[in-house]
Amino acid sequence: MVRTIAFYNVENLFDTIDQEDTLDEDYTKDGRNHYTSNDYKMKISGLSEVIAKIGSKRTANGPDLIGLSEIENAQVLFDLVDQPALDSLSLGIIHKNSPDRRGIDVALLYRQAVFFPLEYDNVEVQLWDKKGNRIYTRDVLWVHGIMDAEELHILVNHWPSRRGGSSESSHRRMKAAWVNKKIISRISQSQPEAKILIMGDFNDDPVDDSIKVGLSSKSKGQLNPGDFFNPMEKMYNMGWNTMVYRDQVHLFDQILLSRPLLKTTDNSGFKFMKAGIYNPEILIAQEGKYKGYPLRSFQNGKYSKGYSDHYPVYVQISKSR
């Protein structure tokens, strides 16, 4: 039995309604991106077709769990799972609003026939600037559930950006890593051998301190209790990427696995099988400034009929029936 667990930054999945409490004016008909209802319908249809095919070379059903970032609200999630391309997955939604000043959240979609949520919560990442003013960013979404009679914990992230410079902003992402470790510590008190997956757009690469030190990312042969294996590090070292930022390619989108998902002594439970970046030709820009990079949704002040400025990533785990 093989299950696919994915993560996708869907690049500003906003509806076209101007909400008073969020900075969403750019994503309206009269806003900077001249974003219409037809644009929204096209974007959400395209995203649904992409999601349905993630990991499909190995399984016929599409992904079983899908973490998302840059979604505006619950309504866009309902619209997304209601698309014909996702009908067969019968996806449930886990989402809570974050205090992010842009109005974007993280969420988890799950196949209701496969995954049963037990509990979930948002955990704040509290940040302040040099003047002591609060910086509002995305919460970490923690989900605890059962898949094929086995407990899993999923942490969905979208860490603070590199705005202001990578080094200057690195402490913010390290704080987000610390929040993850705090959640993991709490889980481990009652479940020392918990199977945990940390996923997200980390705005850092697999070799950066927030991942290597903050999340205790190690290679397979060096894992101690509390450490995590990051299959995306090898991909990064091979030159693979999921997005471009300021003319530099990066692999910000990652999924890490706790040590119990790497053990080979117990054949009865889920084990890591493989990881990948889903980037078929349809998701790659064929011309223009971003040729060879993800076919983004918005360019030059308009919807450009693309999908996202990130590629989705996934891991596959397997177990004996």
List PLM regions with ranges.
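N-terminal, active-site-proximal structural segment of metallo-dependent hydrolase catalytic domains
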Residues: 1-86, 94-100, 104-106, 283-291, ...
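Active-site-proximal beta-strand elements of phosphoester/diester hydrolases
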Residues: 4-12, 32, 119, 151-161
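Active-site beta-strand/loop signature of hydrolases that rely on acidic residues for catalysis
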Residues: 5-10, 40-43, 47, 54-77, ...
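Active-site His/acidic residue clusters
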Residues: 21-24, 28, 148-172
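Soluble non-cytosolic domains of exported or imported proteins
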Residues: 34-45, 68-74, 135, 167-175, ...
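Structured beta-strand-rich core segments of catalytic domains in phosphoester-bond hydrolases
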Residues: 65, 71-151, 159
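Extracytoplasmic/secreted cell-surface and envelope-processing proteins
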Residues: 75-78, 102-103, 163-166, 205-210, ...
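Metal-dependent phosphoester-hydrolase catalytic domains
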Residues: 186-196, 203-321
